[in-house]
């Protein structure tokens, strides 16, 4: 009969072996989980509310505005932008950017240095005038609780002074990135005399849906007129005080004056206006499955390659540095040997906005057209400089 100590020693060794095995297993699980979290982690901000604002206020950007000076480089020498210049004249867009005194130099000026210069008219709305940007001073208080008040005052000012300068009027934040060429392409077959507005359509609260404020929303001229002359100060559904979520209150007000919340998706059902940075839409599983975003989308939200139209218009929560990254990727980076053909803007029909069939290459640049476009841009910028 073996001594008791023999069994005790054998049991201890077995227990030790099992403990080591369990420890290794747990360690591997934790390590794998950590790796997966790193893989799906994001460098960008994920908002915990559909009405979050100011999350990039403390993200530092370049000390000075950046600009490219490669107009005469080999890659741009043979670039043909006549279609974009044609649409610049045909589809006039006024962009107004919601900002505040603290963001003028940290965020707003980087908007002006990138996509803002492609607006027919560019206005920055703040509570304090700034002649360098420039920014207009609205008689409102700052803070997220006053965004609806600022929005109402901005549209009233635009209706009063800038109604005839544009056909479409887009509102966005100072951390929104817009591709104006794609916005004009989307709007070019639509009438500014129709009561409609477009953006990223959310579905709670407002019966017909409403557009995400951060992704930007664009009003036709008729919609702007109805908003100011029939809605604000006239309808119960147009909230009189400064409270409420800006985009929700805008949706309620526009619905009350029979402005339709339009569908901005492309013919494949992919969205054009995006409430987050590209990474959050393109990479699956970055956004938590229990996040508000999934239940707020009017149309089923898609992840990965099906998330975004090839002619995407906007992205939100874009920090200053990323403004320049997107500017480079959209307007400067080119795959050598690949050229694009464009569908005739006269023949495009609604709902098939980027067919490859019946495509045509644009005509070559004309110096007179180029000078006309530069004049339009200069007038818009000059107008902005003298409004504050």
From Swiss-Prot:
Regions of this protein lying in the Lumenal compartment: 31-388
Known glycosylation sites: 80, 376
Disulphide bridges: 95-119, 238-253, 307-308
Location of region: Disordered: 43-65, 344-388
First-listed, main subcellular location of the protein, grouped into a coarse class: membrane
Stated role: Glycosyltransferase that generates the core 1 O-glycan Gal-beta1-3GalNAc-alpha1-Ser/Thr (T antigen), which is a precursor for many extended O-glycans in glycoproteins.
Keyword Nucleotide-binding: yes
Protein name from the UniProt record: Glycoprotein-N-acetylgalactosamine 3-beta-galactosyltransferase 1
UniProt cofactor(s): Mn(2+)
Residues that coordinate or bind a glycoprotein: 292
EC number(s) reported in the record: 2.4.1.122
């Amino acid at each position: 009969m073996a001594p008791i100590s023999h069994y005790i020693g054998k049991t201890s060794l077995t227990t030790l072996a099992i403990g080591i095995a369990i420890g290794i297993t747990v360690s591997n699980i934790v390590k794998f989980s950590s790796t997966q979290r790193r893989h799906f982690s994001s460098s960008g901000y994920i908002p915990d509310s559909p009405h979050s604002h100011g999350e990039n206020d403390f993200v530092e950007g370049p000390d000075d505005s950046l600009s490219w000076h490669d107009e005469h480089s080999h890659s741009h020498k043979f670039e043909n932008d006549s279609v974009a210049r044609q649409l610049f004249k045909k589809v006039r867009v006024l962009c107004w950017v919601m900002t505040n005194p603290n963001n003028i130099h940290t965020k707003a000026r980087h908007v002006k240095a990138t996509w803002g210069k492609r607006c027919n008219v560019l206005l920055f709305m703040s509570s304090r005038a700034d002649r360098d940007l420039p920014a207009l001073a609205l008689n409102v208080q700052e803070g997220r609780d006053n965004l609806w008040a600022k929005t109402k005052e901005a549209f009233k000012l635009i209706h009063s002074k800038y109604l005839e300068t544009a056909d479409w009027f887009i509102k966005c934040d100072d951390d929104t990135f817009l591709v104006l060429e794609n916005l004009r392409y989307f709007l070019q077959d639509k009438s500014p005399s129709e009561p409609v507005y477009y953006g990223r359509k959310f579905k709670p609260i407002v019966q017909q849906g409403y557009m995400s404020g951060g992704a930007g929303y664009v009003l036709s001229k008729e919609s702007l007129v109805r908003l100011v002359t029939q809605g604000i100060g006239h309808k119960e559904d147009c909230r009189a005080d400064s409270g409420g979520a800006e985009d929700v209150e805008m949706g309620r007000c526009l619905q009350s004056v029979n402005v339709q919340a339009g569908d901005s998706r492309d013919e494949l059902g992919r969205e054009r206006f995006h409430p987050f940075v590209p990474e959050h839409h393109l990479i699956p599983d970055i956004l938590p499955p229990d996040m508000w975003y999934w239940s707020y989308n009017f149309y089923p939200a898609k992840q990965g390659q099906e998330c975004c139209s090839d002619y995407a218009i906007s992205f939100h929560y874009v920090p200053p540095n990323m403004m320049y990254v997107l500017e480079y990727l959209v307007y400067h980076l080119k795959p050598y040997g690949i050229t694009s053909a464009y569908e005739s803007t006269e023949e495009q029909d609604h709902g098939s906005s980027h067919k490859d069939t019946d495509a045509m290459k644009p005509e070559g640049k004309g110096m007179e057209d180029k000078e006309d476009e530069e004049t339009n841009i200069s007038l818009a910028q000059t107008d902005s400089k003298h409004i504050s």
